[in-house]
Amino acid sequence: MKIKSSEFIISAVKREQYPDDNLPEIAFVGRSNVGKSSIINSLTNRRGLAKVSQTPGKTRLINFFLLNKDFYLVDLPGYGYAKVSKKEKASWGATIERYLLNRGPLKKVVLLVDCRHKPTADDVQMYEWIKHYGYEVVVIATKSDKISNNQIGKSEKLIKETLGLPKDHKLKFFSSLNKKGKDELVDYLFDDLVEEV
């Protein structure tokens, strides 16, 4: 499919601020600085759609973007940034959990992990959280331009083992820089959402 239009709709904290038109949603979540904003901009062909911050932990709200006027891409706050207070970390966690809890229009959650590193305890917890709430999980390993083709297999094994992914889980590797395989990834993520509309 092609992303023909993308627009920012709202930054939300409370449930009553979420869009209520019942269009399908796909949420993106990951550690601070995993490249979440960059991948959203890359997939939507809009360089400034999601704000790319040099400061980790900057995204503290839930941002809703309407794609093709058919479905929402939802940018959840980044987690795991060390230089914030425990109170602030708890607040981010509560914001994410509030969204995941009984969110009818949410069809799948994309968990982003950095392919250069072993997934953290926070990544594992997030994966378990998403499964607990009964959503389909798609795992994308970001920044794949930073490792060689020879390292891809080793990275895939480490990520799958650490997160406890099923053997048949289709782990996707992607780089927002070279955008290799972007069209296939867009189809993989969004096609079935469009079918539901």
Swiss-Prot record:
Its cofactor is Mg(2+). One of its GO terms (biological process) is division septum assembly. CDD domains: YihA_EngB. PROSITE patterns: G_ENGB. One of its GO terms (cellular component) is cytosol. Mg(2+) binds at residues 37, 59. Residues 22-195 form the EngB-type G domain. It comes from the Bacteria. Pfam families: MMR_HSR1. GO terms for molecular function: GTP binding; metal ion binding. Belongs to the TRAFAC class TrmE-Era-EngA-EngB-Septin-like GTPase superfamily. EngB GTPase family. PANTHER family: ENGB-TYPE G DOMAIN-CONTAINING PROTEIN, MSS1/TRME-RELATED GTP-BINDING PROTEIN. Necessary for normal cell division and for the maintenance of normal septation. This is Probable GTP-binding protein EngB. It comes from Clostridium perfringens (strain 13 / Type A). The gene is engB.
